[in-house]
Amino acid sequence: ALGDQLLSVFVDHTLVDEVA
């Protein structure tokens, strides 16, 4: 679903921020 994809992108960026 579009919402799922958007959430996935949001989570991906959040994880990157956490690692960085």
From Swiss-Prot:
Pathway: Purine metabolism; GMP biosynthesis; GMP from XMP (L-Gln route): step 1/1
Keywords tagged on the record: ATP-binding, Glutamine amidotransferase, GMP biosynthesis, Ligase, Nucleotide-binding, Purine biosynthesis
Record field: catalytic activity: XMP + L-glutamine + ATP + H2O = GMP + L-glutamate + AMP + diphosphate + 2 H(+)
Class of enzymatic activity (EC top level): ligase
Entry EC no(s): 6.3.5.2
Induction: Repressed by elevated hydrostatic pressure.
Cysteines joined through disulfide linkages: none
Molecular-function GO terms, alphabetical: ATP binding; GMP synthase (glutamine-hydrolyzing) activity
Residue ranges annotated for the GMPS ATP-PPase domain, each copy included: 1-20
Function in brief: Catalyzes the synthesis of GMP from XMP.
Assembly description: Homodimer.
The protein, known as: GMP synthase [glutamine-hydrolyzing]
